[in-house]
Amino acid sequence: MAAESNDSQKAMNLGPTLRDEPPSTEEIEQRQRKASTSSSEDGEHEDNDRRRVVGSPGSRDGSPRVGSPVARASPRAKRDQKSSDSDSDSSDSDDGVMRKIRSSVMHIRRTSDEETKNRERSSSPDRHEKKSKSRSRSRSRSRSRSRSRSPRERYRRARRSRERERDRYGDRERYERRSSRERDWEHRRRGRSASPDKNDKPPTEEPPVKKRKETLDPILTRTGGAYIPPAKLRMMQAQITDKSSLEYQRMSWEALKKSINGLINKVNVSNIANIIQELLQENIVRGRGLLARSILQAQAASPIFTHVYSAVVAIINSKFPQIGELILKRLILNFRKGYRRNDKQQCLTASKFVGHLINQNVAHEVLCLEMLTLLLERPTDDSVEVAISFLKECGLKLTEVSPRGINAIFERLRNILHESEIDKRVQYMIEVMFAIRKDGFKDHPIIPEGLDLVEEEDQFTHMLPLEDEYNTEDILNVFKLDPNFLENEEKYKTIKREILDEGSSDSGDDAGGSGDDEDDDEEDEEAAAGEEQEKVTIFDQTEVNLVAFRRTIYLAIQSSLDFEECAHKLIKMDFPESQTKELCNMILDCCAQQRTYEKFFGLLAGRFCLLKKEYMESFEAIFQEQYETIHRLETNKLRNVARIFAHLLYTDSVPWSVLECVRMSEDTTTSSSRIFVKILFQELCAYMGLPKLNERLKDTTLQPFFEGLFPRDNPRNTRFAINFFTSIGLGGLTDELREHLKNAPKMIMTQNQEVESSDSSSSSSSSSDSSSSSGSSSESDSSESDSDSSSDSDSSSSSGSSSDSDSRRKKASGKKKDKSKSKKSSKAANQRSPLEERPTKRHENRRQDASKEDRRGSDKHNRDPQRRGQQDESPPARPRGEPERIRGQKEPHRHAQDHQDRPTDSGRHKDDGKNSRVNKDKDRRRSREKEPLRRSRDRSKSRERSRKEMDSRDSYGNGLERADKENRHSDRYKESRRKDDRRHR
């Protein structure tokens, strides 16, 4: 500011030289004197100023600061001298001087402005005070100087002073702003507490504060305190004996709040019935504020489930209308609050909930019309968007109950659209809304499927206008002590029983027998009525529905890009189960109609077979039907059908048991069926390869289903199958058939021998039974006679001779019977295979033979002691397991010895008869003992054959076993012939 005052003084000093005449010499001398006097005065003032300024914060070294009066005085005098010199030069160059003066003044102003800015940044409030004092002194000087000047100069000085004052006020305002910031900063700094010293000791009063916190009951706090586990909460409730106390009520309130919040958060379309039952188990009359708050919060958090929450409110409103009214009041107030605050999101959620409540008949449609009128009265982009979303939810309901009202709303929307005062996006939304109305709100039903749970007669509709004042009853959201807590709980329990029909079962049990009889009669009448209705069922024999069904399937197949899309379309048709087979037939017919086979149909059929078992069974039945009627198809259709079934078999979509209906023989096949089988197996070989196909056809679990395909019952059919598969290039599948055909004669012989052996075994079994009975009776008689003779040894010779003759006759007859019996038994034993003989019978026969031999040995011992030596000389019995060759060598030697030892008298003849009978018994026993050895030999042979033919095993591999049986029978037959020859010798 001081620099500006100096500039103004310079300008004023320069002023007379611009417009007045040039001064004379006398005037110049007077000015010099004045300048000297003023300089002396200024020097005195400067000394005083130096005394004041020394020691101030701005001058550390005692030198005069920039902008001080001392620094300003000398340049002022110099400028005055320069101006006087310029005035005394010449009067002709006024214009040039004027230009120079103006430029110098402008330069001085700029430099002065920069200097003032720098000084303002670095100066303090003390400097400003000193500057103001110096300015006042300079003003007084300038005033004393300006009194003698012209009015034009005064006017200029006044203008410059006004400019200076303006600049001064601006600087002061800047300083005041800066000082106010500094004061605020200092004030905040003073408000902060000083950081505690590290050495400070902790306060001694902290333990009592902690004790006070521990004494607080977390349950009695406003938020319920920390989380308490349910088990601990139940334990705490059980410990409280007074159920009406504050603590118990508070705990029950917390449990009620948690259960309501949990149930509301879990509800969806599928479990809404269960959630409502669990919700009614809680005292929602006491917690109606909690319930309303939970529903509104859940709906605001997830508006996509608004239809579910509206269904919950509708069910609760039908039982407790005051709860539905409370929720609707809070919704209306939320909408009004959001509308006043221009909160679009809150308006959207609230209006959507109100729209669904109108659809559920909880709120009246007048409320909807009022809200739409309010939104479209002064339309904006947001209000029109909210109105359109609201109309989408309840437009169909308004169309039914208030067509005039919704027509007025759409007229208003049309006017808004034509006025074009809204955004393009909102205009498109209005056009979409008209299109939705034209389609009949098909994507926005009144009540979604599965949520129409309340009858219209049971619902209570609330008539609540939009502009009324409502009480939201927020006090219900917080806990409050109930003096009649137990009574209210009992009242709610009775209400709950009535709602949930818990007492209906008890009342039904107390009813009399008459009621049961009446119920039975009613049920019988209903059943009879149902039967009559079933009798009246009309069947459409024109198959119009079948034709339409086939047409839809054909169009769906032809309009699909891939098989997955086609399967999805066909499944979504929801056709009845009776049409399952028709669908499979249609897929097969569409495949057969193609010029060439398309894999699309095979994949489609395979997908249906994997989806459901019914489709697989349908394709199995279709395979059999198609094979039986294959002669009706053309060659092209036949090829496509065979290839689609080959694909199903390769992918195991259809079991391989379907090949059971194929029988390869000259009589059971036609040219069409042979072509079908040829294409089928060639496709299978192309899909799987010959080794895998052969392995699948040799699977033991599937052999019963391949008997007709690879027949073994007749060599003619076997030869036909071999030739057929060889001709189509699949001869590798017939290796086992070829082996079977080679062994067929042997198997036929074994079969015939088995038939003969079975007949002979049946006859021999009957004869052996009769002979065994007669032999046992004769043996018993002989034993009795022997005992009698031994006991009566002292009797007379006459009685002894008679008894000897009787015994001889009996022995002769017994010998004949034994011969016939031994022949029959040897034949039966030779003809009967060791596997056919039962082990129990073998054991019984062995026991009987052993008992007979013991009896005979005892008879021989008692009758003739001389015979004992002959028996000792006879060869011993062959041990078990002795080879047949050794036995054959011993038997001729034994017969020769018998011929040498044969006596000539009658007694020796008797002994020879007995010896021959004993030898026959021994031979019989040896033949029976020989059978296990033969059996073990046959088993070892069969094991070796089974090892060799393990890989080529099939169901008809028993031909080798039959051949083994034949070999065994032939060996046995040869051995029996040898025995007979030896006996006859």
Curated annotation (Swiss-Prot):
Q: Which UniProt keywords apply?
A: mRNA processing, mRNA splicing, Nucleus, Spliceosome
- Name the residue ranges with Polar residues bias: 1-11
Q: Where in the cell is it found?
A: Nucleus; Nucleus speckle
Q: Where is the composition biased (Acidic residues)?
A: 86-95, 501-531, 781-791
Gene3D superfamilies per UniProt: 1.25.40.180
Identify the residues that the record assigns to the MIF4G domain, covering every copy: 257-440
- State the oligomer form and interacting partners: Component of the pre-catalytic spliceosome B and the catalytic spliceosome C complexes. Component of the minor spliceosome, which splices U12-type introns.
Protein's name according to its UniProt entry: Pre-mRNA-splicing factor CWC22 homolog
Q: Which organism is it from?
A: Danio rerio
